[in-house]
From Swiss-Prot:
Keywords: Disulfide bond, Ion channel impairing toxin, Knottin, Secreted, Signal, Toxin. Pfam families: Toxin_22 (PF08092). Residues 1-21 form the signal peptide. Probable ion channel inhibitor. The keyword Glycoprotein does not apply. It comes from Cyriopagopus hainanus (Chinese bird spider). InterPro entries: Toxin_22. This is U11-theraphotoxin-Hhn1d. The lineage of its organism: Eukaryota, Metazoa, Ecdysozoa, Arthropoda, Chelicerata. Coiled coil: none annotated.
Length: 113
């Protein structure tokens, strides 16, 4: 019976000591995994940031292309009625009273400067 007890005690001590070693090893392994996870998250954040910056650059390019190629906003041509307070006559034209009043419906028209 003593040999069984000694054997059982010996197996128990070995199991406990190996279990402790595994526990420390598991802690180190988990630490490594979390560090790898953090580095992966950092990499993913940088990749996403780079993609967003690329999209933003493309959008800004389109906006600048529009402003370069865009024509003048809608404007009123010569001889067309305009508003005295908000003259939207095309460049080179001025919103003035016509020389012959009463013929036209509105009192101001776009004329050359």
């Amino acid at each position: 019976m003593n040999t069984v007890r000694v054997t059982f005690l010996l197996v128990f001590v070995v199991a406990v000591s190996l279990g402790q070693a595994d526990k420390d090893e598991n802690r180190m392994e988990m630490k490594d995994k979390t560090e790898q996870g953090k580095s992966y998250l950092h990499f993913a954040e940088n990749l996403l940031l780079q993609k967003l910056e690329d999209v933003e650059a493309k959008l800004l390019e389109k906006d600048s292309e529009k402003s370069i190629n865009s024509r003048q906003k809608r404007c009123i041509e010569e001889g067309v009625p305009c508003d005295e307070n908000d003259p939207r006559c095309c460049s080179g034209l001025v919103c003035l009273k016509p020389t012959l009043r009463g013929i036209w419906y509105k009192s101001y028209y776009c004329y050359k400067k």
